[in-house]
């Protein structure tokens, strides 16, 4: 089956991509570029020869191949990124009719489709944060930025969370009011943001175009007058679409972040909930979002378009940073004023770092599971685990749901602290038998990470995130090479168990 990855792989050669096929179905490949093809490609650009029958037939064949390749590629983009993303990629990336689908065009169209579809592995998760932005193109088109906190983890829809932070002026700004501090207002949802980001003139043209096309379709093209034919050419561009109330709006660029704690994929409710170690602190963001809205009502906070603290982008960034974005990427304030473009770039950097860490965490989990394929390692690890008998899961579930009493939580925190000490002692015991000449740099790095990153009940979310990232990345590098002995495999499993303790303490920290 043809997919986006097949086009990306074929385009790496630098040649144009073509779609062929046989009885087994269509196949994507790089176009043949032999002596004959090179000669005809050269002659097609020579004024005196490009109209020759042979050259013209070759050029027309290439155009037809390029069109077919583009059609199949857009279909593949639609399956992965949705119709809106594929349409945006075609509108902005295809450009010339019959142009070759080469490496640059494939890369650009995939990038555009990803942009309109939304960026981030957290998109299908029940607990997520969405950072939205509309491009800033100067003071006349300043764009916008907003942030939404969603929690649809509970089976009862009445307990779902939808907190939207969208900072606007309470009046239309004049050309000389960009530095004025005026009364703010907050919008309650993304749909209202979309409507606010499309001008009344554009909305009118879109309605006229839609009405003209409907009339021409009903009556026939030959009965349409000149104005109707002119209006019918005004199609919505990528991102411009009607909502369920038949109102036009402009879709935003979207960046998705996971919430720390137990989460699940909304598309697959049968799968068990998994703990997300790297993400944003939902409770802290909700508190700050509500503080911002209270500040708007009380007059403590104002709107100022050119500002580092009181425009839409700075408010969205404020709530994002309240959730711990700076645990992953340091934040650098704008020199004069925050804007949606700078905010979007920072959100992308944070999302990329979070997703990379979570992917590394999942990779460590898979590799450590394979270490147990050895019977001797499995038996030794089972003996160590059964001697402790502690488990992080009950604490994590209870703490994450807020159902454990304070006394029970403290008792389990003490239990986890003892388990941290036990894992550390076991790791040290396994390492004691290795002399200096047998310890390589990776061993030393893992031993140092185990010592520095042991969690405790005193750690807050920032400290636990820092410890988890160091330990996950260090262990991940250590797992790139197969273990030379059973003791080496057991040290890796001990480091993996320490990551599990960090998860348990993290669950308690976000519930506090």
UniProtKB/Swiss-Prot annotation:
Annotated family: Belongs to the BopA/IcsB family.
Classification via Gene3D superfamilies: non globular Virulence effector SptP domain
Ranges in coiled-coil conformation: 347-377
Species whose genome carries this gene: Burkholderia pseudomallei (strain K96243)
GO CC terms: extracellular space
Top-level taxon in the UniProt lineage: Bacteria
Localization of this protein: Secreted
Principal location: secreted
Protein name as it appears in the record: Effector protein BopA
Source taxonomy: Bacteria, Pseudomonadati, Pseudomonadota, Betaproteobacteria, Burkholderiales
Gene that produces this protein: bopA
InterPro entries: Globular_prot_asu/bsu (IPR011070), SptP_N (IPR015203), SptP_N_sf (IPR044899)
Function: Plays a role in mediating bacterial evasion from the host autophagic pathway.
UniProt KW keywords: Coiled coil, Secreted, Virulence
């Amino acid at each position: 089956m043809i997919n986006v990855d097949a086009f990306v792989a074929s385009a790496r050669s630098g040649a144009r991509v073509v779609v062929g096929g046989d009885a087994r179905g269509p196949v994507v490949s790089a176009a043949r570029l032999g002596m004959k093809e090179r000669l005809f490609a050269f002659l097609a650009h020579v004024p005196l020869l490009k109209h020759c029958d042979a050259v013209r037939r070759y050029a027309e064949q290439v155009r037809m191949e390029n069109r077919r390749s583009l059609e199949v590629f857009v279909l593949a983009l639609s399956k992965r990124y949705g119709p809106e993303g594929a349409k945006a990629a075609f509108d902005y990336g295809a450009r010339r009719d019959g142009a070759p689908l080469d490496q640059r065009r494939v890369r650009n169209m995939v990038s555009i489709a990803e942009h309109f579809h939304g960026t981030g592995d957290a998109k299908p998760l029940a607990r997520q944060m969405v950072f939205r932005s509309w491009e800033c193109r100067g003071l006349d088109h300043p764009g916008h930025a907003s942030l939404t906190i969603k929690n649809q983890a509970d089976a009862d829809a009445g307990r779902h969370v939808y907190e939207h932070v969208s900072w606007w002026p309470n009046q239309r700004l004049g050309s000389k009011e960009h530095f004025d501090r005026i009364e703010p207002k907050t919008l309650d949802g993304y749909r209202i943001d979309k409507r606010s980001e499309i001008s009344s003139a554009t909305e009118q043209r879109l309605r006229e175009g839609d009405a003209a096309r409907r009339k021409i379709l009903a009556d026939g093209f030959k009965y349409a007058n000149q104005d109707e034919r002119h209006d019918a050419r005004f199609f919505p561009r990528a991102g411009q679409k009607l909502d369920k109330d038949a109102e036009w709006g402009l879709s935003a660029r979207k960046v998705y972040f996971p919430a720390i704690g137990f989460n699940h994929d909304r598309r697959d409710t049968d799968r068990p909930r998994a703990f997300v170690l790297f993400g944003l602190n939902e409770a802290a963001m909700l508190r700050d979002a509500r503080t911002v809205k209270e500040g708007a009502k009380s007059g403590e906070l104002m709107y100022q378009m050119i500002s580092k603290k009181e425009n839409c982008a700075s408010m969205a960034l404020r709530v994002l940073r309240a959730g711990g974005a700076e645990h992953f990427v340091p934040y650098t304030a704008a020199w004069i004023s925050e804007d949606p473009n700078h905010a979007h770039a920072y959100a992308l950097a944070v999302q990329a770092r979070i997703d990379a860490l979570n992917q590394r965490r999942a990779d460590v989990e898979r590799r450590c599971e394979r270490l147990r394929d050895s019977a001797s390692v499995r038996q030794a690890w089972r003996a160590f685990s059964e001697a402790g008998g502690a488990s992080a899961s009950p604490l994590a579930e209870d703490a994450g749901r807020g159902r454990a009493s304070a006394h029970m939580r403290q008792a389990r925190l003490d239990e986890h602290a003892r388990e941290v000490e036990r894992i550390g002692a076991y790791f040290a015991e396994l390492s004691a038998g290795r002399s200096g000449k047998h310890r390589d740099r990776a061993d030393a790095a893992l031993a140092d990470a185990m010592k520095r990153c042991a969690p405790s009940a005193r750690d807050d979310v920032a400290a636990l995130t820092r410890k988890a990232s160091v330990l996950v990345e260090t262990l991940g590098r250590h797992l790139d090479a197969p273990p030379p002995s059973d003791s080496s495999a057991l040290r890796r499993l001990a480091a993996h168990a320490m990551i599990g303790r960090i998860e348990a303490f993290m669950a308690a920290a976000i519930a506090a």
